[in-house]
Each structure stands twice: as C-alpha cells, then as structure tokens.
Amino acid sequence: MATALITGASQGIGACIAERLAKDGYNIAINHYPSDGDKANAEKVAETCRSYGVEVALFPANVADYAQCEEMVKAVKKQFGGIDALVNNAGITKDGLLLRMSEEQYDAVIAVNQKSVFNMMKLVGAVMLRQKHGRIVSLASVAGLYGNPGQMNYSASK
C-alpha cells in the first residue's frame, strides 16, 4: 500500500488532503507542529483516516527546521517502508503592514512556508529517487500572484 506524508495535516487543507488520500487507500503520515493543540487536532484527523482501513501515524516536527525534518523522514520511512507521495502543505501567516512588520514576523513565515518545502523536497526527494518513484505536491496561494494588504511576507512565500 502506498504512503503519503502530508505536512501541516492537523487542520484545514492538510487535514482534508489526508482524509481524501486515506479514502483513496494511502497509508497516511500526518505531520503536525509539536504542540499539544496541534497533536489533539492531528489525532482527530488520524481517527477519521483510520476509518478508511489504512495505517496512520503522527509525526510531530517543525518543518522549518532541517534536522527535525530529517528525523521525521527517517521515522516515516522506518514505519512505512517508504514514501510514495509528499504533500507540502504546512503554512502560517503573521499579518502586518510592511512598515510595522518585524524581521521576526517576516522570517517565521518564510521559514515555514518556503524553507520547509526545500527541507522536505530535498529529504523525501532522495527517498523517492532510491525507490525510483514518488509524487510531490506543493501547495501555493493566489496571494503569491496578486498579494494581499498586510501579507507581504505571506505573499512572498507563496
């Protein structure tokens, strides 16, 4: 059975993608930010996914941190034997007008929304090359094309 790793799958679009892929027969590796609230949400998503008869596991990691991504990918590979699909879904917003935006607000959004894609594609891409198969989907936003007031950092990251 194929395995999909979805980043930011504890809520929103990521949760919906996890549930749909489970319905389609994929085993599901749910990544969530390592916090109690995100873990509780991820457990609810996992319960729904398991109702489709697939194997599901939670993998807490801050995907903006390369070392945490590396450990997560190793753990997913160990648990499921490989990774057939990666969905780069994790994303955050820290809205504010540019002249009032702190460098920390800007950097946090870029790290999660952009650097995480690099981290995951580099690590999972290597797994997929060794397997000689795999699929990667990276989510974007219309904000990356048109921008939104107060979302300079988010728009730049998408």
Feature annotation, model-predicted:
Residues S10-Q11, P34:
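Conserved glycine-rich cofactor-binding loop
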Residues Y26-A42:
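Conserved glycine-rich Rossmann-like NAD(P)H-binding loop of the short-chain dehydrogenase/reductase
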Residues P60-M72, E103:
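The beta1-alpha1 cofactor-binding region of Rossmann-like NAD(H)/NADP(H)-dependent oxidoreductases
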Residues L97-L98, Q105-D107:
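Substrate-binding pocket helix/loop in short-chain dehydrogenase/reductase
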Residues L99, Y146-M152:
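Active-site loop immediately N-terminal to the catalytic Tyr-X3-Lys motif
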Residues M121, S157:
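Active-site helix of classical SDR
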Residues S141:
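Residue(s) in the substrate-gating loop at a strand-loop-helix junction
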